Amino acid sequence: MTTRLGTADDLPAFNRLMTATGARDQFAIHQPQYYAAALELFAPDNAALLLAEYEGRPLAGVMVFTWGQSAAYLYGASSEMPAYAAQWAAMRWARARGCRSYDLWGVPDADEATLEAGFTERQDGLWPVYRFKRGFGGEVRRTVGAADRVYNGLLARLYAWRRGRQA
């Protein structure tokens, strides 16, 4: 297993991994051009695509973004275990840029006692993701969280209706 810093040429492989991961773990992913735009807008100094490969074949990839002394893992894809190698490479990349914190972005919405009591057993929601992230150590820090900014209310309601949700 090797890890390396990816380039824009690696985005098709990253997108294939994202598609497989989204299907396996049942979550929506962005269009390929979204990831390309994110990398283009923030790289080379404030974003990186890191890949874990075996015999030249990408098995996992992560996109990490930095600002100041902080780094955040926002997008990741894998064919199971190589995600650890890609994540560790991303942490080392961020540390080499002077980052003092690395945000793994998202855990189940539960207090720490519940997190500790349930992380080995629970399989629903974000629990498997938490188990993966917990393996790196660190501490849970709560922040406000992410939200979508709606620029066109009518389109947002139509989109929500189409997806079968309430706006």
Per-segment meaning from a language model:
Residues R24, T114-A117, Y151, R162:
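Hydrophobic alpha-helical segments
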Residues E55-F65, M81-P82, S101-W105, L155-A167:
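A short, terminal or domain-edge coil/loop segment
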Residues F65-G138:
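Acyl-donor binding region in acyl/amide transferases
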Residues M1-M81, R92-A96, D148:
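A conserved beta-strand-loop-helix scaffold within acyl/acetyltransferase catalytic domains
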Residues R16-L17, T114-A117, G153-R157:
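Short secondary-structure transition/capping segments
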Residues R122-A167:
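Short hairpin/turn module used for nucleic-acid contact or packing/dimerization
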Residues R4-G6, L51, S101-L104, R142:
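A structural signal for short, well-ordered beta-strand segments and their strand-loop junctions
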